[in-house]
From Swiss-Prot:
Residues 109-186, 190-268, 283-362, 370-449 form the Kringle domain. One of its GO terms (biological process) is negative regulation of gluconeogenesis. InterPro entries: HGF/MST1 (IPR024174), Kringle (IPR000001), Kringle-like (IPR013806), Kringle_CS (IPR018056), Kringle_sf (IPR038178), Pan_app (IPR003609), Peptidase_S1_PA (IPR009003), Peptidase_S1_PA_chymotrypsin (IPR043504). This is Hepatocyte growth factor-like protein. The gene is MST1. Transmembrane segments: none annotated. It comes from the Eukaryota.
Length: 712
């Protein structure tokens, strides 16, 4: 073979499309359904047993009358849709069962190349003139006939003649026949700042023109980045390129994955000015903590952090001079790459990195607009929005939530308009039904008045009786257990559940308090409104990585998340369906309201988290701890422990909860039943010898738990 045919063959291969996925033409909204409000118009039927979303995209892609589809991750169902979110009479709604995929050309607000494939809904020219409908010949006659293929719908801007200036339209002004619509190129519509970690634009090709691989696919290039978990701009392309993690770009596949500078950057315009960023914080972190600028310099396990300007014991790419916008000073915890929380490389050679979960989360509540006394039962103000800023539903309304409290059912509390009230004496203050279909009720943008003295709950414990909860076949004998979670031993805790992300990886613990409800820690989730599609609860196994076919294993999708009252650090998870109770899966009892566990009570913690080398973290570990009073606990913690928290004694040996255990139970044995008295939350240092551990006190929030489960 001569050199010319060989050269042509190489050129042909270099321009080959590669393993292109049909999903590349779609944009996804996780945990979302698209509803059409007109009953006369219906979607396509559900097609079951579709292998995955790619197969569904392959069905929808070639069809001119298919513009989107729903994909049910649990049932592998696929439903084709003839409309998008920009179509008239449609509404997006949060969903716990499916994702919405829409063709990019129909939902982009910018154009690719000259915009021939643009199918958006802009209908006004750059000069502000309304567009003429393509089906009309007046005031400007033309030769174009609308079809499904050319997309000449209504009076939307289009580019049927491939004009280099982009989409245009005939105008309704007889004096101006046609005009450009001035729709920006996707390369210019959104620019990037710093290293592009906050970029959320629509560019899906590299600077050299190669198309990017989808983040939710693992082919042709496998990668560790989970959509919604790692929200990055890094471009993984399909044309023989791997990703590079220093700004948007990619590196050739002949080089192994490594942290290096980009050689094929994404086609995005860089900005010299910093965009409006989330405010920096010093003592807490918001979201994923990218704006945290405090001075914590140890991990949640108490391991000192490695300096960012050092390459020992761990080599890395985060040189402070390359990431000046990330404030990588000394060895302070930071989040330069958009992980789920601030983190650092550790000073231990055997532990590369760890999260700094001991840094508390900032509250995301809106500013209170008024105050109340006591529990707010006598509050008669006019505040009508929740602590998250959601408008309250009128008490007389039947939608979106059917109220249990009306004028007739609460004669002593005037339920006027949509004002915040407390008709049921909720101990956490005035509340309301909300106008958000996914949030039945929430507490209001109110605070306790400064001159109001909250009654103490630290009083004598009263009698507790339980029936069918908190039972297990075998339990650790508190008298004969050997303290070896850190310092724990393998054991059975049938109400302890494992929370799993989309990849099936354990990330937190939880407690089964009802057949369809799990209580866990707020620290386990980046937001109270994040999509739970693909997230599951695993029950009925002692193993962090159970074998396929394990008979008692149950894995149930999470359907809904409800964040607890302000300051609670709690989250209730509603499951897609009830669990099946058996010897391996049992409910744990909830304590009476405001119950205080007597000092000296023996309790246990359970989890699959970090053991710091003291045990087997592949199985469920249990450790025994003894409750101490808040007064004794505050001697060590310098008065920082609140009444809504409780403590266990520090032991000589390192015994306690660490990363991966958060959200799990502190269960105390009372009257022959195990009772959920505390929830594991990050402490300043986990399992520190002679140092009391702090837990959220469940009894303070048990009325909220019952209320959420009752209202669904």
């Amino acid at each position: 073979m001569g050199w010319l045919p060989l050269l042509l063959l190489l050129i042909w291969f270099s321009g080959a499309p590669g393993q292109r996925s049909p999903l590349n033409d779609f944009q996804v909204l996780r945990g979302t359904e698209l509803q059409h409000l007109l009953h006369s118009v219906g979607p396509g039927p559900w097609q079951e047993d579709v292998a995955n979303a790619e197969e569904c995209a392959g069905l929808c892609g070639p069809l001119l009358d298919c513009r989107a589809f729903h994909y049910n991750l649990s049932s592998h169902g696929c439903q084709l849709l003839p409309w998008t979110q920009h179509s008239p009479h449609t509404r997006l709604q949060r969903s716990g069962r499916c994702d919405l995929f829409q063709k990019k050309n129909y939902v982009r607000t910018c154009i690719v190349d000259n915009g021939v494939e643009y199918r958006g809904t802009v209908a006004i020219t750059v000069g502000g003139l309304p567009c003429q409908r393509w089906s009309h010949r007046f005031p400007n006659d033309h030769k174009f006939t609308p079809t499904l293929r050319n997309g000449l719908e209504e009076n939307f801007c289009r580019n049927p003649d491939r004009d280099p200036g982009g989409p245009w339209c005939y105008t309704t002004d007889p004096a101006v026949r046609f005009q450009s619509c001035g729709i920006k190129s996707c390369r210019e519509a959104t620019c990037l700042w710093c290293n592009g970690e906050d970029y959320r634009g629509s560019v899906d090709s590299t600077e050299s023109g190669r198309e990017c691989q989808r983040w939710d696919l693992q082919h042709p290039h496998p990668h560790p980045f989970e959509p919604g978990f790692w929200t990055k701009i890094w471009t993984t392309t399909i044309a023989g390129i791997r990703t590079a993690r220093s700004g948007p770009g990619a590196i050739p596949p002949t080089r192994r994955w490594r942290e290096s500078s980009a050689t094929y950057p994404a086609a995005v315009q860089r900005s010299e000015a910093q965009p409006s960023q989330e405010a920096t914080t010093l003592n807490c972190f918001r979201g994923k903590g990218e704006g945290y600028r405090g001075t914590v310099n140890t991990t949640a396990a108490g391991v000192p952090c490695q300096r960012w300007d050092a390459q020992l014991p761990h080599q890395h790419r985060f040189a402070p001079e390359k990431y000046a916008c990330k404030d990588l000073r000394e060895n302070f915890c930071r989040n330069p790459d958009g992980s789920e929380a601030p983190w650092c490389f550790t000073s231990r050679p055997g532990m590369r990195m760890a999260f700094c979960y001991q840094i508390r989360r900032c509250t995301d509540d809106v500013r209170p607009e008024d105050c109340y006394h006591g529990a707010g039962e006598l509050y008669r103000g006019s505040v009508s929005k929740t602590r998250k800023g959601i408008r309250c539903q009128n008490w007389s309304a039947e939608t979106p939530h059917k109220p249990q409290f009306k004028h007739t059912s609460a004669p002593h509390t005037p339920l006027e308009e949509n004002f915040c009230r407390n008709p049921d004496g909720d101990s956490h203050g005035p509340w309301c039904y909300t106008t958000d279909p996914g949030t039945p009720f929430d507490y209001c943008a109110l605070r306790r008045c400064d001159d109001d003295q909250q009654p103490s709950i630290l009083e004598t414990a009263h009698q507790v009786l339980f029936d069918k909860c908190g039972k297990r076949v075998t339990r650790v004998d508190p008298l004969h257990s050997k303290l070896r979670v850190v310092g724990g031993q393998p054991g059975n805790s049938p109400w302890t559940v494992s929370l799993r992300n989309r990849q099936g990886q354990h990330f937190c613990g939880g407690s089964l308090v009802k057949e369809q409800w799990v209580l866990t820690a707020r620290q386990c989730f980046s937001s109270c409104h994040m999509s739970l599609v693909g997230y599951e609860v695993w029950l009925g196994t002692l193993f962090q990585d159970p074998q396929p076919g394990e008979p008692d294993l149950q894995h149930i999708p999470m359907a809904k998340m409800v964040c607890g009252p302000s300051g609670s650090q709690l989250v209730l998870l509603k499951l897609e369906r009830p669990v099946i109770l058996n010897q391996r899966v049992a409910l744990i009892c909830l304590p009476p309201e405001r119950y205080v566990v007597p000092p000296g009570t023996r309790c246990e913690i359970a989890g699959w988290g970090e053991t710091k080398g003291t045990g087997d973290d592949t199985v469920l570990n249990i450790a025994l701890l003894s409750v101490i009073s808040n007064q004794e606990c505050n001697v060590k913690h310098r008065g920082r422990v609140r009444e809504s928290e409780m403590c266990t004694a520090g032991l000589l040996a390192p015994v306690g909860a660490c990363e991966g255990d958060y959200g799990g139970p502190l269960a105390c044995f009372t009257h022959d039943c195990w009772v959920l008295q505390g929830i594991i939350i990050p402490n300043r240092v986990c399992a520190r010898p002679r140092w009391p551990a702090v837990f959220m006190r469940v009894s303070v929030f048990v009325d909220w738990i019952h209320k959420v489960m009752r209202l669904g």
